[in-house]
Amino acid sequence: MSTTAATTLGRELLEAARAPEFAGWLRGLRRRIHQHPELAFQEHRTSALVRAELDALGVAYVWPVAQTGVVATVVGAAGPGPVFGLRADMDALPIQEMVEWEFKSLEDGKMHACGHDVHVAMLLGAAKLLQSRRDHFNGKVKLVFQPAEEGYAGGYYVLEEGAVDDVQGIFGMHVDAGLPAGVVASRPGPFLAGSARFTATINGKGGHAAAPHHAVDPIVAVSSAVLSLQQIVARETDPLQGAVVSVTTIKGGEAFNVIPESVTLGGTLRSMTTDGMSYLMKRIREVIEGQAAVNRCTAAVDFMEDKLPPYPATVNDEEMYAHAKAVAESMLGEANVKLSPQGMGAEDFGFYAQRIPAAFFGIGVGNDGGGMAETTTKNQLHSPHFVVDEEALPVGAAFHAAVAIEYLNKNASGPSA
């Protein structure tokens, strides 16, 4: 596809998505999903909505995938070709929404505070655009509506079930309240950190607070461990390589005059590389066990890898990033495509990027000119005050579709499904 044709395609898709009827449909989808947020692996209502919309569009799908997920396929009518993937996550967060608006969450203690309602609506919009333009591309587009991104590794289980084994390239997006609507951003190579959780129990010997010499105090041991863990990042890792160790929970005794028998602590570790993740896990175990021993205690450290697979870093394939960037520039203009800094947040899109050439972009949902979604320090992901500018919905739908169509046409002579 020529540069002129690619530019024309992207702008045609964006114009179609911004048409009043289409944009209104996108807003309606997003608001329906927003009012009924569902936590990880509980996305039954959202999954049913996705399937109903796909049925209405005449798009075939497989369900269930990874418990509640849906994987749909739009088949190009221009002939055989490769398979390209687009992915959106569906789950919400255990947060009480504090935003007062007509479509506020109706589910107590649950909120789409990370924009996954936007992601689902945009991908359904892409499905509609792709289905109406099947004669414009070869091959197939797989649309992955994935459960459980928020800490429960839904993407890992989608891959384990083989739902995207035939996909040769994949693309995803995440809302970014720090960018205005109509702007996208990413970077080649490592983009988001890998992440894992840890928990540890330090066991001592309980006793009366008046006679600590008759006890073995696990609180002293856990205090030493917390302080020593900070040295891993401060003194053992390259300051130019992102790494974070955060202790976020400590639970000990209940009485003021009793030294407890044991104390538990837990937290997260993050790194931009696989080697960095392995090193942090090794040293966290050594430090906690070592500080426990120094203080006459014992420790058991658990990274919960069987229940909560660690997230790998999200690393953008250089060629796939360049492809998506070129599509965005032709559709939105170069001024609206930014180079994003690396971030220490984690995304289970990293599982896809480990196996498939992938590109992951941020899409602006902030609004600098007033309106509902003002870009402020209050409007952050995972905040009960999080809001979005719905003008981003058509942009995301068109961007998804354009990235897929242009990839398939550019690689039409490649492997066929």
UniProtKB/Swiss-Prot annotation:
The keyword Signal applies. It is an enzyme of class 3 (hydrolase). Pfam families: M20_dimer, Peptidase_M20. Its EC number is 3.5.1.-. The keyword Zinc does not apply. SUPFAM superfamilies: Bacterial exopeptidase dimerisation domain, Zn-dependent exopeptidases. Disulfide bonds: none annotated. GO terms for biological process: auxin metabolic process. InterPro entries: Amidohydrolase, Bact_exopeptidase_dim_dom, ILR1-like_Hyd, Peptidase_M20, Peptidase_M20_dimer. One of its GO terms (molecular function) is IAA-Ala conjugate hydrolase activity. Keywords: Hydrolase, Signal. Hydrolyzes certain amino acid conjugates of the plant growth regulator indole-3-acetic acid (IAA). Belongs to the peptidase M20 family. This is IAA-amino acid hydrolase ILR1-like 3. It comes from Oryza sativa subsp. japonica (Rice).
